[in-house]
From Swiss-Prot:
It comes from the Bacteria. Pfam families: Usg. One of its GO terms (biological process) is L-tryptophan biosynthetic process. It comes from Caulobacter vibrioides (strain ATCC 19089 / CIP 103742 / CB 15). The lineage of its organism: Bacteria, Pseudomonadati, Pseudomonadota, Alphaproteobacteria, Caulobacterales. This is Protein usg. Probably necessary for the cotranslation of trpF. It may also function as a subunit or stabilizer of phosphoribosylanthranilate isomerase (trpF). Coiled coil: none annotated. Pathway: Amino-acid biosynthesis; L-tryptophan biosynthesis. The keyword Amino-acid biosynthesis applies. Keywords: Amino-acid biosynthesis, Aromatic amino acid biosynthesis, Tryptophan biosynthesis. InterPro entries: Usg.
Length: 89
């Protein structure tokens, strides 16, 4: 059985990394960084949006900014047809 990560990649998901800057609850003048990483679908990022909605509703640290990077680890350009049989002797 394939891993969940591999199955998601085969369905078009890519690895998404978000740098989330937020104000510390006890010291609102200070920013803290949280790095979040999960497989998600670009460009709408439903998983990331769900996490940020949870953050805004349930956590005390007010969001300041979010920077997102996304990369599909498996994509069509990595596949090519090879004709022939190779024998090792």
């Amino acid at each position: 059985m394939a891993s969940k990560a591999f199955e998601l990649q085969m369905m078009g998901y890519g690895l998404t990394t978000a740098e989330i800057h937020y104000h510390m609850p006890d010291h609102p003048g200070l920013l803290q960084l949280y790095v979040w990483q999960e497989y998600d679908l670009a460009p709408k990022f439903p998983t990331l949006k769900g996490f940020l909605d949870f953050w805004a509703k349930e956590l005390d640290g007010v969001l300041h900014s979010v920077r997102v990077a996304h990369n599909r680890l498996i994509s069509p350009r990595e596949w090519r047809v090879v004709n022939g049989v190779f024998t090792l002797q």
